[in-house]
Amino acid sequence: MRAPGMRSRPAGPALLLLLLFLGAAESVRRAQPPRRYTPDWPSLDSRPLPAWFDEAKFGVFIHWGVFSVPAWGSEWFWWHWQGEGRPQYQRFMRDNYPPGFSYADFGPQFTARFFHPEEWADLFQAAGAKYVVLTTKHHEGFTNWPSPVSWNWNSKDVGPHRDLVGELGTALRKRNIRYGLYHSLLEWFHPLYLLDKKNGFKTQHFVSAKTMPELYDLVNSYKPDLIWSDGEWECPDTYWNSTNFLSWLYNDSPVKDEVVVNDRWGQNCSCHHGGYYNCEDKFKPQSLPDHKWEMCTSIDKFSWGYRRDMALSDVTEESEIISELVQTVSLGGNYLLNIGPTKDGLIVPIFQERLLAVGKWLSINGEAIYASKPWRVQWEKNTTSVWYTSKGSAVYAIFLHWPENGVLNLESPITTSTTKITMLGIQGDLKWSTDPDKGLFISLPQLPPSAVPAEFAWTIKLTGVK
């Protein structure tokens, strides 16, 4: 404010010209249309990845469909049974189902009777998941929404008689959990796909009548935050018309500003084109990639869908899940952990237990995970039991094994006069010292087991280090 009695000086000509110039520049900037992406990979690959995905770090994957009815072997049951004719699958059918029983006969048994989307969403929220990806359609072709081009082979016409995709999306969004839709481009036994295959994929009957109408319908109907494409491997992206779809998705779709996609858009695309990279199932890079990536893995080591023949030894241990999460985030990736519900819509207790263990760990250590960035060093020298992340000026050292002597040795951080060291979940600063040859020594809190803030991994927070 001016002092009382002061008179304002008129703006000089130079100042007026400057203000006019700045105003005109701002008007031009605002008038410019948003960038449009052309249907080619150089243009599409140049689109910046929406920030929410890198910040999310942890998501839950759900494989659910008619394959959840036989619930044996894996979600590839139909292909192993009738596509490959594996003897063990044929024997399973002979022993458990009458002669002439077809895969389509499983459809009415996919009831989702106990599917309560609010309960699922509560579980995923308690697990600390920031996004959830649901199979809308696996390679069997059955759609978990009333697809207008999947007559009598969708969850509204057969089985549950419900819109499973829509119901789960509503529940997740009440909790501000991002919603991803998995969609298989191919269908093993669809007549039009088999016709295109017979024609060497020089025709696109299946793509025009089935794949593309479904993708556009999913986007317009459910407005997903993420599209997790799969089933691309038999054909190039030119057969799938992938670049045309993605240019529409980025330019004109209702989710153009926020949507994220993966890299499975043609046999030539994985780890090369798309939004973020999956590269392959359960991908684990050996060093920091230069592109955003995601590790997708399953609690059941041998299947993505639920299977009745799962043994306890087939279930990934809680400590291994936490370790994979930590390593993935340290290397700049997201961790997408899969569960397979039953045909009734139940998530079996051991899967719930594993998810809740992740949530409990993240409730203490999430500061080092969510919205973090890789540090200049991703793991401690000469060991794979200490991993680093960073956020702003803070560095986080996550260690997977509690040292027997209660002292953690870190060689990578360089201390300064302002260094401060704490442990997430514990009040107060930790004592530390340095050695010119061996680096930093941190005295861990001496606590009874019941007072240790987390299981499986612990986080040291360092500020004022280089």
Swiss-Prot record:
Signal peptide: 1-31
UniProt keywords, alphabetically: Disease variant, Glycoprotein, Glycosidase, Hydrolase, Lipid metabolism, Lysosome, Phosphoprotein, Signal
Residues bearing PTM Phosphothreonine: T170
Annotated phenotype, changing G65D: In FUCA1D; loss of activity
EC category name: hydrolase
Residue(s) at site: May be important for catalysis: C296
Record GO cellular component, one term: lysosome
InterPro entries the UniProt entry points to: FUC_metazoa-typ, Fucosidase_C, Glyco_hydro_29, Glyco_hydro_29_CS, Glyco_hydro_b, Glycoside_hydrolase_SF
Record-level GO BP terms: fucose metabolic process; glycolipid catabolic process; glycoside catabolic process
Pfam families registered for this protein in UniProt: Alpha_L_fucos, Fucosidase_C
Entry's localization field: Lysosome
Residue positions the entry lists as glycosylated: N241, N268, N382
Role according to the record: Alpha-L-fucosidase is responsible for hydrolyzing the alpha-1,6-linked fucose joined to the reducing-end N-acetylglucosamine of the carbohydrate moieties of glycoproteins.
Family: Belongs to the glycosyl hydrolase 29 family.
Disease: Fucosidosis: An autosomal recessive lysosomal storage disease characterized by accumulation of fucose-containing glycolipids and glycoproteins in various tissues. Clinical signs include facial dysmorphism, dysostosis multiplex, moderate hepatomegaly, severe intellectual deficit, deafness, and according to age, angiokeratomas.
Subunit structure: Homotetramer.
Protein name: Tissue alpha-L-fucosidase
